[in-house]
Swiss-Prot record:
Its cofactor is Mg(2+); Mn(2+). InterPro entries: DUF4743 (IPR031804), NUDIX_hydrolase-like_dom_sf (IPR015797), NUDIX_hydrolase_dom (IPR000086). This is Nudix hydrolase 20, chloroplastic. Gene3D superfamilies: Nucleoside Triphosphate Pyrophosphohydrolase. CDD domains: NUDIX_Tnr3_like. It comes from the Eukaryota. A motif (Nudix box) lies at residues 244-265. Probably mediates the hydrolysis of some nucleoside diphosphate derivatives.
Length: 374
């Protein structure tokens, strides 16, 4: 196509998420030499230090949460909310360290240039194209071998690579859960990728987050969960009543019902009352990881006598807390898992806890969706 890679160069540097097709090139089919994956100790150590994110843990208690929330909520001061949004949108100055990951002429992700060193070893799976017409702007792109035409073939081939990289500790925390790889939510799925590998390939990730609330004596209260200390990610931190990533092959509504049962013991009859209220999005770059997430937000008003009961062992306990107190905790602490704060801030807008009279109101609202929400 005429737009090709030269026009893409401007896209990568100034407007990362514009949809530009990339001219298809005939790429050589080379043999995959898996034995060449043996890395020198120095190189392997350096890769791990750059690629592994240390899980966040917290030793605070519910008493700490309640004590923090007791301070009077000041709806006019939005500073703490901006800080939480910034926490989920780090690393924009590092965009130049990544190159596009392309399938069928569509950008589906972004891969760190140094991480591509591992992928170059798998010659039958990944191919690399340089942009000869404007090399000063773009350092080429990564794609899959043209022999891999079917989604299921791509899924199997890439899964073999991820297993090797996972066994070597280069991609930690393998979950055996597949995420769809596609340029946008309603686009066709090009293949499926192990969830733990998603940020290393910079693919779009989707999730469902539900605000479970109760109205009592004219006051709104939110059910908040505290993650189990055995969780591999964000152990012991505060979380939504129900939240989860969106795997391949299940709808948002279907996944929400499943998560409601597993995480809080909410029956389908009650879960079906949840209302889809929008989405938030963010982009977080941390070393080799490039997270482009869209979270679909739901509200569910629960009966006053409802008490959640975790079924899958991933939640330590729950607490019903007035919304104004939850807002204060988000403002003043880092007790919440970072992306949960965004969904609750959106809830605060919709339920009148953040008002137009507050300085920065529109800026804050816009920044909840200031990345590619598609």
């Amino acid at each position: 196509m005429a737009s090709g890679f030269c026009s893409l160069a401007l896209t990568v540097t100034t407007s990362l998420f514009s949809s530009h097709a990339i001219t298809r090139r005939v790429l050589p089919i080379l043999r995959w030499r898996s034995s060449s994956m043996s890395l020198s100790p120095l190189r392997h150590s350096r890769a791990l230090s750059a690629a592994t994110t240390v899980p966040i843990s917290s030793s605070f208690t519910w008493d700490d949460v309640i004590e923090t929330g007791r301070a009077e909520y000041n709806s006019s001061d939005l500073t703490g909310f901006f800080e939480k949004i910034n926490r989920c949108n780090r690393g924009s100055e590092k965009l130049g360290e990544f190159i596009p990951f392309v399938i069928e002429e569509q950008i589906v992700g972004y891969i760190h240039k140094r991480f591509t060193e591992y992928l170059r070893e798998f010659h039958d799976i990944f191919t690399f194209s340089q942009n000869g017409s404007c090399p000063d702007r773009v350092d080429g792109y990564v794609t899959l071998n043209l022999m891999l035409q079917k989604p299921e073939d791509r899924t199997r081939a890439v899964a073999d690579v991820i297993k090797i990289l996972g066994d070597k500790g280069i991609i930690p925390g393998i979950r055996n859960e597949l995420y769809p790889v596609k340029p946008s939510f309603n686009a066709p799925v090009f293949f499926s990728l192990e969830r733990a590998a998603a940020p290393y390939f910079g693919i779009k990730g989707y999730g469902v987050h539900m605000n479970g609330y109760v109205e009592r004596d004219g006051q709104k209260l939110l059910w908040i969960g505290k993650r189990s200390l055995s969780k591999s990610t964000y152990p012991g931190m505060l979380d939504h009543l129900v939240a989860g990533g969106l795997p391949h092959g299940i709808s948002c509504g279907g996944n929400l019902v499943k998560e409601c049962e597993e995480e809080a013991g909410i029956s389908r009859a009650i879960a079906d009352r949840a209302i889809a209220v929008g989405a938030v999005s963010y982009l977080d770059i941390d070393q080799y990881c490039f997270k482009r997430d869209v979270l679909f937000c739901y509200d569910l008003e629960l009966p006053e006598d409802f008490v959640p009961k975790n079924q899958d062992g991933e939640v330590e306990s729950f607490k019903l807390i007035p919304v104004a107190q939850v807002a204060s905790v988000i403002k003043k602490t880092s007790f919440f898992k970072a992306n949960c704060s965004l969904v609750i801030i959106d809830f605060l807008f919709r339920h009148g806890f953040i008002r137009p009279e507050s300085s920065g109101y529109l800026d804050l609202y816009q920044r909840l969706r200031n990345r590619d929400c598609s």
